[in-house]
Amino acid sequence: KKSFVTKHNYSLLRLTINSNEFHDEKNYLIEISIKDNSKKIQNLNFKIKVHHTASIPKLIDSNFFYTNWFNINKMEEKHTLKRWSDKWYKMLEKYAKIMADGRQNCIIIPGELISLKNNKIHLDEDKMISFINVFRKNGFKYFESPHLLGRGKNDDWGSPELITNLRGRGYFSEEAKKDIDTIIRKIKKFTKKNNLTNQWLQHIADEPTDNNAECYKQVSKQIRAIYPEIKIMEATNAKESLNGAIDFWCPIINDFQENEEFFRSREKIGEKVLIYTCLVPGGKWLNRTLDMERIRQVYFGWAGSKYNTFGYLHWGLNQYKADPFKQSVVKHPSPIASPTNYLPAGDTHIIYPGKDGPLSSLRFEAHRKGIEDYELLEILKSKNKRKHSKIVKKLFLDYENYSTSISKYRRIKRKLLKSL
C-alpha cells in the first residue's frame, strides 16, 4: 500500500505500474481510496488482465522509428542549468529516460556541436559522444545530424539555392561546397570511430521543395561521394524532383496517403518511408494537437502496421515559444508568417517542464500506447496476415477514417492480445 497527501484543493495524480510487477497470467485488482481528513470519499477500482503471450520488445530492438526534436536550450531555461555541467547531464538523463519510456528511439544532435572555432569548422567529438552515450544507455537506436543548410535568415521558400547554416553561404559558391566537404569528412571520421555508421541519419535541409530540389540533389551527391554508406533522411515537401537524393523519405501524412504509389515505388528500390505531422494537417487527419482526441495519437502505431511505414517524426518535443502551462497557441515563428498565422494548440511540445525534471502528457502516453500496439500488431502479422488485416480494419482504415470509440478500441485491443 502506498499513500499520497496533497494540501491543494485540486490535484492531478498519475498512477503508473511497471508490467514487471505482474508475475502471473491472471486478473489483478487495483484499488485507489480518496479520503478527506481520513473520511473516505470514493473508491476507484481498476481491473488488470495480464496476457503473458504478448510482449513488447526492448526499445533497442524496436523496428518502429520515432523521433521528437529535442531543444536543449529550453531544457536549460526551464531548469536553470549550465550546459555540459554535472547537473546538466543528470537532467539530460531524465529527459532521455522519459523519451525512452514513450518509445522514442531517435534523438537529434545539438547543432552547436558542429561550430566555428577560430574561424575553422570544428566537430566537438568529446561532447558529441558524451551526449549520444546518454541516449545509447537508454536504448536509443538512431541519431539525427543537425541540418547543414536551410532557407536562410529570411526563410525564403522561393529561392532555388540553399544556404549553409554555419556561415550563411549560398551552396552554389565554392566556399559553401568546401564547408560541406569539411563537415561530412569530420562526421565520417567521428561515426566510423564510434561505430555509428548504421545509426547516423544525415539531414541536409528541412522540407526541401521543388524550388530548391536541384540544389538539394547536388548537396546529396557531394555528401555521398565523400561518405557512400551514409543514410540521408528528410522531412519532405517535394517528391519526383528529389528522386535519388534521399534514403529515408518523411512526407506529411496527407502527402503520403494521396501519393502512396510514388512512395511505394521508392521502397521498391530500397529506400524507407516514414511520416510526419506538424501544424498541419487538421480536420479529421491524424495529428496530436491538444484539441484532438487522444485516440488519434494511438492510431499512428496502427497506421505504421497497416501501411508498413518505418515510423514517425515530429518537430516538437519541447520547443516552447511560451509558458506551456499558460499558453498552448503561439504565433508562427517564421519571419515570413502572416500576422494571423498561429501554431495549433500544443504543436510546439508534447512533454512539460516539471520542477525536478520533464513531465509526460496524455498525448505522449497515447502515442506510446500506439507504438506498443504496433509491436503487437507486427507479431500478429508475422503469424497470421489475414487476422492482422481484419483486426486493423475494425478500428483504422486510413489517416482520415478511424473509430474514435474508446470502448470499441479496448474491445478490439483485447481481441488482439488474445490472438497472440
What is each model feature region?
Residues 1-14:
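Surface-exposed binding patches on compact interaction domains or structured appendages
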Residues 24, 90-91, 123-127, 215, ...:
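Short, glycine/acidic-rich beta->alpha junctions
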Residues 10, 25-29:
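Extracellular Ig-like/FN3 beta-sandwich strand-entry sites
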Residues 18-21, 29-36, 42-226, 235-246, ...:
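Aromatic-lined carbohydrate-binding surfaces of glycoside hydrolases
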Residues 267-297, 316:
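Active-site clefts of carbohydrate-active enzymes
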Residues 292-342:
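Substrate-binding cleft of secreted/luminal carbohydrate-active enzymes
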